[in-house]
Design a protein with these regions (language model features):
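Cytoplasmic membrane-interface "Motif A"-like loop-to-helix N-cap segments
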Residues: 77-87, 281-295
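Juxtamembrane intracellular "pre-TM" segments in multi-pass secondary transporters
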Residues: 3-10, 193-225
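C-terminal ends and interior cores of transmembrane alpha-helices
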Residues: 89-102, 295-309
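Extracytoplasmic gate region of multi-pass secondary transporters
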Residues: 35-37, 218-276, 333, 360-371
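Helix-loop-helix hairpin linking two adjacent transmembrane segments in secondary transporters
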Residues: 145-193
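Conserved MFS/SLC helix-loop-helix module at the cytosolic interface between two early adjacent transmembrane helices
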Residues: 66-105
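Helix-breaking motifs and short loop linkers at transmembrane-helix boundaries and internal kinks
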Residues: 47, 79, 100-106, 134, ...
Length: 422
């Protein structure tokens, strides 16, 4: 089925196709955070150590990040319908396998499959946006898509905990797997590939590889990928791993309020995604939101780390602003598409997303390494306790990342929301 013309492209079918893609990304974020909610059950049922639990959690990111670029190539060559449907099927099977696992090894295999299956959620949806919805609204709709993903993360926390308390963790993740199977069926039956979505299929493999080499040889691709990693990795490392600890030990918040403070930061991140895309589309410029996001992140990180113990409201406002500014990273996807050959859009956004997720995968263990270096030796109930000073020293890596993001802005090319290559 061919894509409709520009003037009529925004039809009900086009929006339904996008909605299914956005649901895929929602599912990706939901699956990403669920293990953090059931960590005690996992350690109990698998007799897992902290290191082993870390391996189980990291399995998702390993396949998710590693497959971004290959998935982008497959999207360009074969179109989103088949790739996204098969991927959702794999994720659903992986989640069901995870729920049925009786030992750690098959559980890790299940999570590897989940990561592999949901990895196409964002880049596949952006590919659908490129070919079914108006190009002038690409950044805005991409931001809304990523906001929907953050909603998945929020629903994957406290609501999932409530369900686990009623059904148990195995039943919960098995039902999550069943949703993946239904999503696969919906994508297969409803999503249609346009002529543009698989244009690379008509090229020779030599032509495809030449195009991919042009992406990797483009300094702008690397500059934007670096920005993506440096702006998104700190907020995701903070909110999904160490932020609650910091809020308790450094700001003196109660455990419940510390968790809530990270939800506030995630809410800011979620709102920053569509607002950053909208601002970019309205301004007719890509670099301004990127500049603003990086500078505001740098300032807010420094205040967060240097203010000894701010009032609760001030702490929540700081976390929200930091998340909001971090969400403006969304504009890099639009700019990356505009400074590379348009027919390889899936490959471009896959590479940018790979660098962003790869930044998280590197920064999380590196932050843990820094904490161990600054640890004063305190142990409670067999668990290392990191002091306020150790946390603040280790987390200086976050504003350092923001500073790199600011520096990268000097080397970006402004597209003025126009396709400048190809």
């Amino acid at each position: 089925m061919a894509a409709p013309a520009e003037s009529t492209r925004t039809t009900g079918l086009a929006w339904l196709i996008w909605a299914l893609g956005a649901a895929h990304y929602f599912y990706a974020f939901f699956q990403r955070v669920t293990p953090s909610v059931i960590d005690q059950e996992l350690m109990r049922d698998f007799a897992a150590t902290g290191s082993e639990l870390g391996s189980l959690g990291g399995a998702y990111f390993f396949t998710y990040a590693g497959l971004q670029f290959p998935l982008g190539i497959l999207l360009d060559r074969y179109g989103p319908r088949r790739i996204m449907a098969i991927s959702a099927l794999i994720a659903g099977i992986g989640s069901i396998g995870f729920g049925l696992a009786e030992s750690l090894t098959p559980a890790i295999v299940g999570r590897l499959l989940v990561g592999a299956g949901v990895g196409v959620g964002l880049i596949g949806t952006m590919k659908l946006i490129m070919v079914w919805l108006p190009p002038s609204r690409f950044a805005t709709i991409t931001g809304i898509t990523m906001f929907i993903g953050v909603v998945g993360a929020l629903l994957g926390q406290t609501p999932v905990r409530l369900v686990v308390d009623v059904l148990g963790w195995r039943e919960t993740v098995i039902w999550a797997g069943a949703f993946g199977l239904l999503l696969a069926a919906g994508i297969w039956l409803i999503v249609r590939d346009s002529e543009k979505s698989a244009v690379a299929k008509h090229e020779t493999l030599t032509g495809v590889w030449a195009g991919l080499r042009s992406i990797l040889a483009n300094p702008q691709t690397w500059c934007l990928g670096l920005y993506s990693a440096m702006l998104s990795a700190p907020i995701l490392t903070f909110t999904t791993l160490w932020g609650s600890t910091f809020a308790r030990e450094s700001y003196g918040l109660s455990p419940d309020m510390a968790v809530f403070s990270m939800s506030v930061a995630l809410a800011g991140f979620g709102l920053g995604l569509p607002s950053g895309g909208w601002a970019s589309d309205q301004l007719g410029q890509r670099k301004q939101p990127l500049w603003a996001g990086a500078i505001l992140c740098l300032i807010s990180w420094l205040i967060i780390l240097c203010w000894p113990q701010p009032p609760l409201v001030a702490a929540l406002v700081l976390f929200f602003i930091n998340g909001l500014a971090s969400g403006w990273v969304v504009t890099v996807f639009a700019l990356a598409r505009e400074v590379n050959l348009p027919r390889f859009g899936g490959s471009v956004v896959g590479f940018i997303n790979m660098m962003g997720i790869g930044g998280v995968a590197i920064l999380q263990p590196f932050t843990g390494f820094l904490l161990d270096q600054f640890w004063d030796g305190t142990i409670e109930n067999g668990i290392r306790v990191y002091s306020d000073l150790a946390l603040r020293q280790a987390f200086l890596v976050f504003p350092a990342c923001s500073a790199v993001a600011v520096a990268s802005c000097f080397f970006m090319r402004e597209s003025h929301n126009e396709q400048v290559v190809g």
